[in-house]
Amino acid sequence: MRTTKVYKLVIHKKGFGGSDDELVVNPKVFPHIKLGDIVEIAHPNDEYSPLLLQVKSLKEDLQKETISVDQTVTQVFRLRPYQDVYVNVVDPKDVTLDLVELTFKDQYIGRGDMWRLKKSLVSTCAYITQKVEFAGIRAQAGELWVKNEKVMCGYISEDTRVVFRSTSAMVYIFIQMSCEMWDFDIYGDLYFEKAVNGFLADLFTKWKEKNCSHEVTVVLFSRTFYDAKSVDEFPEINRASIRQDHKGRFYEDFYKVVVQNERREEWTSLLVTIKKLFIQYPVLVRLEQAEGFPQGDNSTSAQGNYLEAINLSFNVFDKHYINRNFDRTGQMSVVITPGVGVFEVDRLLMILTKQRMIDNGIGVDLVCMGEQPLHAVPLFKLHNRSAPRDSRLGDDYNIPHWINHSFYTSKSQLFCNSFTPRIKLAGKKPASEKAKNGRDTSLGSPKESENALPIQVDYDAYDAQVFRLPGPSRAQCLTTCRSVRERESHSRKSASSCDVSSSPSLPSRTLPTEEVRSQASDDSSLGKSANILMIPHPHLHQYEVSSSLGYTSTRDVLENMMEPPQRDSSAPGRFHVGSAESMLHVRPGGYTPQRALINPFAPSRMPMKLTSNRRRWMHTFPVGPSGEAIQIHHQTRQNMAELQGSGQRDPTHSSAELLELAYHEAAGRHSNSRQPGDGMSFLNFSGTEELSVGLLSNSGAGMNPRTQNKDSLEDSVSTSPDPILTLSAPPVVPGFCCTVGVDWKSLTTPACLPLTTDYFPDRQGLQNDYTEGCYDLLPEADIDRRDEDGVQMTAQQVFEEFICQRLMQGYQIIVQPKTQKPNPAVPPPLSSSPLYSRGLVSRNRPEEEDQYWLSMGRTFHKVTLKDKMITVTRYLPKYPYESAQIHYTYSLCPSHSDSEFVSCWVEFSHERLEEYKWNYLDQYICSAGSEDFSLIESLKFWRTRFLLLPACVTATKRITEGEAHCDIYGDRPRADEDEWQLLDGFVRFVEGLNRIRRRHRSDRMMRKGTAMKGLQMTGPISTHSLESTAPPVGKKGTSALSALLEMEASQKCLGEQQAAVHGGKSSAQSAESSSVAMTPTYMDSPRKDGAFFMEFVRSPRTASSAFYPQVSVDQTATPMLDGTSLGICTGQSMDRGNSQTFGNSQNIGEQGYSSTNSSDSSSQQLVASSLTSSSTLTEILEAMKHPSTGVQLLSEQKGLSPYCFISAEVVHWLVNHVEGIQTQAMAIDIMQKMLEEQLITHASGEAWRTFIYGFYFYKIVTDKEPDRVAMQQPATTWHTAGVDDFASFQRKWFEVAFVAEELVHSEIPAFLLPWLPSRPASYASRHSSFSRSFGGRSQAAALLAATVPEQRTVTLDVDVNNRTDRLEWCSCYYHGNFSLNAAFEIKLHWMAVTAAVLFEMVQGWHRKATSCGFLLVPVLEGPFALPSYLYGDPLRAQLFIPLNISCLLKEGSEHLFDSFEPETYWDRMHLFQEAIAHRFGFVQDKYSASAFNFPAENKPQYIHVTGTVFLQLPYSKRKFSGQQRRRRNSTSSTNQNMFCEERVGYNWAYNTMLTKTWRSSATGDEKFADRLLKDFTDFCINRDNRLVTFWTSCLEKMHASAP
C-alpha cells in the first residue's frame, strides 16, 4: 500500500546514536515498519531515483513525523534535508538487483573470501558508492543493474550476481613492434604514435581518473625473420634462441622489458621512455647493424609472436599463489597490435593458450590499431603442420571468442568519421533481378527467410574446390570425393551440411585458383562471384559447430545423429575452414573426427552448443532483454555515430570481459520449458524440415528482423531443450558491421572471474562422458583424539570451507534454475534433490541436504552435506584433452639492461585439472591444522616469505638525504650496547609472535652495567652454517684455533676472558644443525619427525656416554633414522641419584616460596647480591624466583605451565646478578647444571638434556608434579605421551636459539688471515670441536644440533581479532636460529585463511618489529630462480655486476691472493666479495633450500638491510676445483660461459614484493634501490679509485699486525 503521507527528512552523521546505520526510524511514527523492511524514500516531485534503505534499527526518541538518513547517502541521492519525503515499504521482489559491481583497491581478495562477502550481503540494500566491509575486506558498490538498465539502488537477493572489479591488478602490457608500427595509417599518423600517444596516453589518463594502482609490466616484443639457410650462419653464442617455423624460416623472438612490476601514481612519463626505445628498436632486434648475423626482417603483426607473448605472462599468472602479495587482485594481459587482429598461429599453442586462459580466469584484451576489417576478428589462421603436401584448399580458421578485442579510434579519426572506408554490402535486389539470375526455385521455397546465411561456408575455398575438379559432372565427383572422406573420418556432422548432389548443374565460369584465393581478402568479390555460389539447401538435421571454446564431445554427435541416410549426404565437400578443437578428440575407435567449419565472413549466426567454458565469464555482464550479455563497447554503426556525435562516449558504460561471445550474443535460454530431468538429446525436431539458405548477394547478410518463422534457424534452435547459443548479431546489423570500440572498463578495472556460472551438462552427458568418483568425510567424528584446546570445526563450517577451497582453485558455483520440481516419473539428474532450490545457500531444512554443484573446465564437483556427513562427488571427463607441453626459447632484455639480450627458455604447459588431490586437501581441511596432514606442493598452497632485518635507519636516511656514497653501513662494528638492544628487541618481537602479554618491562634484558663492559657479542659476522660465507672484512671473524688461544689467555685475565669465552665455550649456543634427519621441513607427517626428534634429544646421560663416543653430529644423526636404536635404553634410564635430588629440590622449593613471601625485599636484595658462582644451585634458583629482583617469570598463559621464563632472560639475569659469572657461557653452564639436576625443565615438560640460550621456554619444577618420576618408569607410555605433548608444544610456540658469534683476535680482514677461519657446518659441530679439545661433553653438542633444527614450524591461529566466524589457520616456517648478522626468515603457507585477516596479523608483526628496532618485509622467494623454475619469472633476468679485480693485481701476479695457498683462492675471493657487500649494508639471507623444487644451488645470497635488493655470489660455496664454473644462466649456451667463467662479480635482483604498504624510513624511498645500484656498480668498477683504496687499507691492516 503506497501512502501519500509526507514526513520531514533529517540527516545524521555516521556513528550517530552509537550506530552506523544509514536509516533511523521511530517505531511510534511508523508502527507498520519492522526490522529488515525495505523502505523507499523520495521527494514528492523529484526526477531523481528514489532511495531504498533497509531498516536495521528503531529509535524511539526521534522527533515526531521525521525520518533520519545518513548524510553521505543523502548527498549521493540529492535528497534535501528538512524537506518533505514519501516513505513507503516496498516488496524486496520488486526491487531486486540482477547484478552488483563491487570495486576494491590495494587488497588481495581470494575467491573464497569473495563468496563469503557476497553471502554477507544477501538480504540487504545496496546503493551506488556504498562502502561494504566484511572481515577486514573493504569494497565499494559501483554499478547496479536490473535487467539491462543501470539503477541507483536496490535489494540484493540470493540470485543477485556480484561481480568484483579490482583497481589494483597485475597488468602486463605487450606492445607488438611488428613492421606495421613504422607505417602510416589512413589519417597520416604512424601506427606507433597512434598506439603510444593515442591509446596508451588515454589508458594512463583513465587509470588516473579511476584512481587505479595497478602493478604494471610493459614489454615491447617482436619477431625477426633471418634470411638464412642453416643455423651455422649465426654466431655460436646466439644459436640457442634461434628457432625455425613450419615453413623452415629462421627467426628469433625478442622481448624488451620496459618496466617490471611497478606501481606509479603517474604513468605518462613512461611514454617518453617507450618513444626513446622506438628509435633504437631496429638495432636492438638485429634489423640493422647486426654483425655476424644474416639479414633480418621484422615480421608482420599476423606472423608475430602474439600467443607466445601472452603465454609468457600466463607463466607468471599461473603462479599467483607463490610470492603472494597482499595488495593486488586480478590478472590482465593487454596486447597492443598495429594489425587488425588476424594472427597465424600454431594449432597446439592456440589450444593450450585457450585452456590456460579459461581455466585460470585471466582476462586477455587485444587492442588493434588497424582498421576493423569486414570479417570476424580476432581471427586465427592455423598452420597445418601435419602434411605439408596436403592438397586441401583453404586455410583453417578459428575465431577465438575467448579474447576480448577492441579497435582503438584516435582522436583525429573521430573528426573524419563521416566517411568510413569499410565497404558496405550491396542493398537488397528486387525480385526481377533474382529471376534474371536464373535461380532455381527448388533451392528455396518462398516462404522461407531469404537471408539466413549459410552458416559457415568459405566461398572461395568452395569455388576453388569446384573449379579444380575436371570433367563435366562436377557435382558427382564432389559427392564421391566427399563420401570417401566421410568414411575416412567418420565425422561429426557439420551444420552447413550442403547436399551438393541435389544441386543443379553448376555454372561453368572458371577462375584460376590464385584469383579465387585472393578474393578472400577482397570483400567486393563476394558480390561478383555470387552467381556461381549455388548453395543447395542443407538438411535441417544439424549438429553443433564445435565452438572455439567449447569442449563438446564427439561422442554425443555419433549417438544422437546416427540416422545414416541423412548423415551420408550431409558433409560439405572439402571446405577446410574450421575450428581447431575437434582435431584433438582422438577416440578409442581410431577415427579422427572432421573439424567443424568456421567461415570468418559469416560469423553472425553460428549455433554453438553452450559449454562451461563459453559460460565462464557470462555472469560478469548485465543481461539484455533477450537474455544475451551486453557488451557496451560493441556498437552498431548507428549508435556509434550518435554517441560520437553527441560526444557522450561514456567509458564507464563499456562493459564485458574476456568472453567475446561473438557480437552481442549468448541468447542463453529462449525456452523456459526445460525440465531438470530432461534427458532428451538436444536437437529433438525431425530432420525433414528444410531450411533454406539465402545468398549473400541477395540478402545483405542477415538484415532481417528476427522472423517468427518456425523454419528459420534461430527458432528451430531455440526450441531445443538444451540451451544453445545462437550467436546472433543485434537484429538489424550483421555481425561484422558491428563497430567495436575500446573496452575501457575492462582495461581500467578488470573483473575477477565470476563466482557463479549457469552451465550444467544434461544427465545424459554426465552419464556418457564422465567418470564419477566419490568419498565421504565425517568432520566431527574424531573429536576425542584432539588435544583439549584444539578448535573443532562443525560439519557446516567444514562444508562451507570445502566450497571456499574449490572457489579458490578457480571453480565456479553452478546456479541452476529454481522451482521446477522434476516430475517423479523421470529420475532427476543424478538422483539429487531439487538442486539449489534456494539459490546460493540452501539452509539446512529438516531432512534436507545442503548441496552445491561446482564446475571448472570439464570437471564437475558435487558437494553434499547431510546428517553431518559430507559427500564429495567428482565427475571427470572420460576422454580428457591432451594438452601439449611446448618448449619455447626467446631472447630477453630485462628492464635494468639497455641493450643486452640474454637467451632464455621456458615451458608452456597446462596442469590437468583432473589430477588435483582434492581428497588430500579435504582431509587437510578436516584436520584443521593438526599435524596429521601437512601442506604438500601439489595443493598449490598460498605462500609468502618474510625477512626480519636489523633496521639501520640512520645510514639509510643519510643516503636518501643525498649522501654521495652508499658504503657507509659497515663503517664501524655495532657497539655492545646496540647488540644487547637488538637481542632484547628480538626477544620482544618473538614474544609478540607468541602473543605473550608482559608486565612492566623496565629491566627484563638487563643492559650491561659498567662492570661488565668486557662482555661482547661480536658485530655482524656471518654465522657459519651450511649456507654461510665467511665473516666480512674488518670484523672479528674467528677460527677454532684463535678462539682456543684466546681462552687460554683468558684464564689469566678476567677482562679478556669476558671478551672471548662468549664466542667460544658456551655450551648451548644454538646450532645451524647439519644433521640430516632433524629438519622437519615439508615432511609428510610432522608427527613422525616429532617422535624421532625426541628419542634423540631425550636419550639419558647414562646411556649417552656409551652411545656417542665423541662422534660428530653428522655421524650421530644417521643411525637415528630408524628411530629404534635409542628407544631401547629410554626405559631404565633414570638413575636413582637423580630422582633423589629431584625430591630434595622440591622441598627446598616449597620453603623458598614461603620465605620469599614473608621476608622483606631488602634482605632478599642482600641474598641476591651475595650470590656468587660458588653458591648452590638451589640458592640461585631461590633468587631467580624473587618477585622483584628475580627473573621475570611469564604470567600464566593458556598452554604454558606456571613459573615459566625465557632462557635468554635468565642468562642475562645471571650475568648481571651473580658474582663471578661474567659471560653468557658461564651462565649457560649453571643453567645446564640446573637442568641436569631437574630443578628446571623445558616448558613442554620434556626431559631435555640441553639448556638452549635464546627464546626458549623453561619452567621451574615445583612440587605440583611429584609423580613425574614414577610416571616415567614404564618406557612405552611415557614415551608416546611425551612425544605427542612435545610435538604439539612445538607447533604452538615459536622458540629460537641465539647463535653466538666467534671473535677473531685481530683486526685483519678474514680474507687476508694466514689461515682461513674454519667454517663448521653448524654451531653444534663447532661446539664439539671445542669440547673435544677440552675433553668436554661432545654428546651434548650432538644433542644440541638435534634440538635446534634449521627450520621449525608453528601452526598459527590467524584470526587474532575475531574478524570472522571461520577457523583461520596457517603454517609458519621460521629459522631455528637467530644471528645478528643474518636475516631471520619467517614463511607463511596457507590454504584456509581470509587474506585480509592474515594481512592484518602480519601488519601487526610489522609494527611490532619496528618498535623492536627491526624491519619486517615481504621478500621474493628465489629472486635468482631461472625463468623455467617454479619460482622463476620468464621476464625477469638478474643483472650481473662485474668486480674489477684486474686493477688490484700486482705487476706480474696472476691472482689476487698469490701469496697464499692456491686452494684457498676462491674462498678468499668469496670472503673479499662478502666484505664489500657488507660495507654496502648487505646481510646474509639463508633461504631454506628445501622450499625449492630444484637442487639447492648453494650460492651465497644476501639481502640489503632495507629489504629492497638481493645480491648473490654467482658461484657455489664448494671449493673451487679445476672445472669451469658456470654462472646461473638461462641456457647452457656458450655466450654465458664466455663472459662469466672466471669473471668475478655479483648477481643483483630487486625485491618486487616491497610495495608502498611496507615502506618506512628504514626501507628508504622508491629511488633508493637505483641509487644503491649505481653506487655499488661504481665501487666495483673502481670509479674514483674506491676499490683500490679499500684493498690497500685492508693490506695495511694485515701488515700492521704482522710480527
Swiss-Prot record:
The record's GO CC annotations read: cytosol; GATOR1 complex; lysosomal membrane; lysosome; perinuclear region of cytoplasm
Q: What is the effect of changing residue 1250 to A?
A: No effect on interaction with KLHL22
What result follows from mutating residue 1201 to A? No effect on interaction with KLHL22
Stated consequence of mutating residue 1154 to F: In FFEVF1; uncertain significance
Record annotation: effect of changing residue 1530 to A: Abolished phosphorylation by PIM1
What sequence ranges are listed for the domain DEP?
1187-1262
What function is annotated for this protein? As a component of the GATOR1 complex functions as an inhibitor of the amino acid-sensing branch of the mTORC1 pathway. In response to amino acid depletion, the GATOR1 complex has GTPase activating protein (GAP) activity and strongly increases GTP hydrolysis by RagA/RRAGA (or RagB/RRAGB) within heterodimeric Rag complexes, thereby turning them into their inactive GDP-bound form, releasing mTORC1 from lysosomal surface and inhibiting mTORC1 signaling.
This one is known as GATOR1 complex protein DEPDC5
Species of origin reads Homo sapiens
Read off the lineage from the record.
Eukaryota, Metazoa, Chordata, Craniata, Vertebrata
Q: Identify the gene encoding this protein.
A: DEPDC5
